Amino acid sequence: MRQVTIQQADSKAEELTVLKANLHTHTTNSDGTFSPSEVIGFYADAGYDVLAFTDHRTTNRVSEYDAEGMTLLSGIELHPAGPRGIPWHILAIGIPENFSCTHPESGQQAVDAVRQAGGVAFAAHPYWCGFTAAEVMTLNGIAGIEVYNTSTRYIGKEYNMTIWDETLDAGRNYTALAVDDVHGKPDLFRGWTMICAKSRQCKDILDALRNGSFYATQGPEFHRLSFHDGIFEAEFTPCAAAVLVGRQS
């Protein structure tokens, strides 16, 4: 956990807390290999700050778990009917532990229920599911998509960059997550989301997810971002290449 300086045009620089997060986690409460306490131990030992539990169609009582210094978020993965007979995989983060809409009939019902409960909804691994960008855009109210998902790499569909790019070109300001979607040990620590929040409290983390104050990564990290007088500046850790991508570029 560290600080980063964010400065937008015509505004003062703001110091935010940077939190390393895995936002897609399965346990033995659905189809995961590890118990909640085992998963917490793995991520705490690896230096993560935030862990969201998102078991299939069921929530976890995260308030009863030993967080081992991390912030734990209550979540769920929902699977309502989708286009062409393909079930949606909707990642919900920040919902109450007693969330009741565990078997929604439609994708829109799922997203609406998540938002009404105070959570944030994302389309999980749409490329792996087989959805097009146009189909993803029928879900009104999602915050974004998983742009990288570790557990779908086995069939070469871990990256969802094309779908994300097409939705952005269509005018949807979707944000992007990188997640492990951990089911077992081979899925650990391959993609994560760096959340820039006012604090490590659940409320501030969820506000950051709603507002897009985060970035997806598999390694490189930002230290400073600035946009002033039409000039974008960034300081970050060493990487193989850095490309600034604009609209339709």
Where are these regions (language model features)?
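A metal-dependent hydrolase metal-coordination microenvironment
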Residues: 2-120, 124, 129-141, 146-166, ...
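C-terminal functional module detector
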Residues: 1-14, 18, 170-175, 182-249
